[in-house]
Amino acid sequence: NNIKLKPVLGQAIEIDINDSEVDLLSLPKQFNIDGINIITKSRSKLVIGSTDEYSTKPEKKVFEKLTNFLDKKPSWLLKGKISKKWFGIRSRPVGEPSPIMKNLENGLIICTGFYKNGILLAPACSKWVANEIREYLS
């Protein structure tokens, strides 16, 4: 079995917006601009994250990196406070789309999808794995 994977970096920040005139719930619940995922968590809380295909080291200036898709940042975003930062390394298939979910041979399955483009894939992937195991055991 010749499945190639490479490491990619995911980074995200949660920003608290302390501006009574801004209601983040007026934005879509989740949207993507140029590969940057924006997720509205509440009226005053926003998560911005992305995957960096070319690095596995987290950026020191994560706010600037994750908001550089905006030509002109709104003042409420510039005044926001970063309440959380996180990063992680995940695998990405080389030469085929993610997630890889394959029954390679009798009793050997592979599932590489946990998180992609702001979408948690683990529940669906786990369900697929459970079904494959059930079928194998029956």
Which residues does each PLM region occupy?
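Active-site substrate-recognition segment that forms the wall
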Residues: N1-E105
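A broadly conserved detector of short glycine/acidic/proline-rich loop/turn motifs that flank catalytic sites
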Residues: D19, D52, F114-Y115, C125
